[in-house]
Amino acid sequence: MNSKIIEKLEYNRIIKQLSDLAITVPAKEQALTLMPSSNFDEVKKSIDQTRVLSNVLRVKGPMPITDFKDVRASLKRLKVKANLNGEELGNIFLILSLAKDVSQFTADLEEREIDTRPIEKTLKNLAIPEDLFKKLNQAIEYDGTVKDTASSKLMQLRHDIQSNETDIKNHMNDYISGKHTQYLSENIVTIRDGRYVLPVKQEYKNKFGGVVHDQSASGQTLFVEPQAVLVLNNRQQNLMAQERQEIHRILIELSELAGMYQKEIKNNADALTQLDFLSAKSKLAKAMKATEPVLNQDHVIKLRKARHPLIDPKKVVPNNIELGTSFDTMLITGPNTGGKTITLKTLGLLQLMAQAGLFITAEEGSQLTVFNEIYADIGDEQSIEQSLSTFSSHMDQIIKIMKDVTEDDLVLIDELGAGTDPEEGASLAIAILDDLRGAQAKIAITTHYPELKLYGYNRARTTNASMEFDLKKLAPTYRLRIGIPGQSNAFAIAHQLGMNEVVVDKARSLMNDEDSDINKMIERLTEQTKAAEQLHETLKQNVDQSITLKRQLQNGLDWYNQQVQKQLEKAQEKADEMLAKKRQKADKIINDLEEQRRAGGQVRTNKVIEAKGALNKLERENQNLAQNKVLQREKRRHDVSVGDTVKVLSYGQQGVITKKLADHEFEVQIGILKVKVTDRDVEKISTQAAPKKAERAVRSSRDLRSTRASSELDLRGQRYEEALTNLDRYIDSSLLAGLNTVTIIHGIGTGAIRNGVQQYLKRNRHVKSYSYAPANQGGTGATIVYLQ
């Protein structure tokens, strides 16, 4: 891409924002050098990677990456077998630690249904050489400080240094707190040349013996190392020298080990840089409220509610921009200061952002393509000077475009033909457009020449467009109107400003009939288009609301079905457990009787009667279990298949099995909704019984809706378990009824039910928020719940 074009479209400001959002220096540098690509596969891959990190940011938050230094210089030194210093090794340890953290952070992405294939190679590079990591972790801090645990010798040396230093300080403290204080300039201990000394008055320098290391500027104070601590200080220096030697040995050992893993270190550093860079892309998308562009290879642009990313979101006016659908050339006509130039810049900048793998500031589903080149001749419509020099520069740029343009390019020209005689300028603009269209490029131009309005109607795959003007406010709205040419509003503006109506009417009469008819036609077309757009927007909002409601209902039904299924499974397990216990009791009775018989003893009559009574009781209990609804459902579980009409027991409604999802799991169509159920939760309806069951299902549905209609649930006077069960059912019903706000009345009492209610609400993913009711509506005796 031409650097001048990138500068004109202010792409550099975008990548500066991107760089600011990166954490590591290498990622910041990568952001500042990011250029749009003209390779479709590269662009798609880049967009896919941005999508992955945007999903990660949304689901898990930012990557656990902190800043680290560029490791390339250290790797060069390792390559020639040079030793690294502590800071360099600490930086490598930091890189490996971050890689380990990020690897753990991304381990469950697939479980969270995030497709990581676009960054799979990058994630695989997060491979930690465990022996190097273990050694560095034992030996060094991130800032390069060598740890005591680096070696047993170093640990002992540092212990000895600390102990010896304590002895020195104790001796010195005796000097500054005892009878020797009269000989000191100050009662302090200081250090000179790495040795502990006392500030002694010049006349008492021989009182302490030892060595004079320094003196004050006046010569009145001498810094003396007393004879009593001279040996200790010498030992301290010796220990510290040994410490330095041991640290040097450790750094050599660590450098040699790091040299064995140069490739792994580079791979981890590169992977972290790439993930930081992609994370910056996702953060930029979030900050701009940008969306993923849908890429196509048909050179089609279809932007919905596109916003210029560098204009204040509170002030910018979003526009729909199209090219390559039913037209390849768009002529935006009309007066200056209406937003024509910004429209061109928005189109060009969003196209550059997409080709750089960035999300765009437009509505979801907006389409963009990948151009080989983007040509732009754009000035500032607020300050264009119609001069010969401007015209020459303008023509020079256009001539270069005409020489190089192809069908794979996008051409953006602001004020085509401006800067010369209007008649000649219009003719020249038409000829230039014909030439550019001959190359089959995608073209968007702005012009104030009225002659080009007819061009937009007369040429194939060419359309007019204009910027809307509010005649009541006498101000531009900055909305783009595709298909409607710009019109002069001079008469309307003059009339609005109070010009004599006679003068305005005379001015209108001086226009030729053809121009007058065209203006009237444009006015009618503008009104009709505006009405159609308003209707379309209303219908779109209604459709969006319906889709959202359907999704909420579907999610609510699925969740409710899961809860019911869990209860059914618990009941089944309990029934199975009860049956097993009864069988064990029966077996024990029989075994006891058999043992007595085998022992040769006579079984007493009362024992036989007791055994028979126990067996009869078990038989009755087993019959009750056999009649248990849960067990009956269990027996019916294998009796359904695709196409069967069934009753979904958890909903009390009738539906048709449309798909078998897995063993014992089916998809059932209930009206407009599809729900996932298990075969335990369905009952096959025979053909003869279907009408009757359907009637019951309708009645059940109506009854259910009736219960859902209530926006209050009163739990006062209920037991704790009963209250929470009723609360669970009520929330489910409220979700299915589409209620957004409900009130739970739990009373004050001991607070047990109130606490139970709020614990339940805290765990429920369909509860957006909750709070106590206002004082006049129950206060702490009621909780208002907001559902989502």
Swiss-Prot record:
The keyword Endoplasmic reticulum does not apply. Its EC number is 3.1.-.-, 3.6.4.-. ATP binds at G334, P335, N336, T337, G338, G339, K340, T341. It comes from the Bacteria. One of its GO terms (biological process) is negative regulation of DNA recombination. Residues 713-788 form the Smr domain. Keywords: ATP-binding, DNA-binding, Endonuclease, Hydrolase, Nuclease, Nucleotide-binding, RNA-binding, rRNA-binding. Pfam families: MSSS (PF20297), MutS_V (PF00488), Smr (PF01713). One of its GO terms (molecular function) is ATP hydrolysis activity. It is an enzyme of class 3 (hydrolase). SUPFAM superfamilies: DNA repair protein MutS, domain III, P-loop containing nucleoside triphosphate hydrolases, SMR domain-like. The keyword Cell membrane does not apply. InterPro entries: DNA_mismatch_repair_MutS_C, DNA_mismatch_repair_MutS_core, DNA_mismatch_repair_MutS_sf, MSSS, MutS, MutS2, P-loop_NTPase, Smr_dom. Homodimer. Binds to stalled ribosomes, contacting rRNA. Belongs to the DNA mismatch repair MutS family. MutS2 subfamily. Endonuclease that is involved in the suppression of homologous recombination and thus may have a key role in the control of bacterial genetic diversity. This is Endonuclease MutS2.
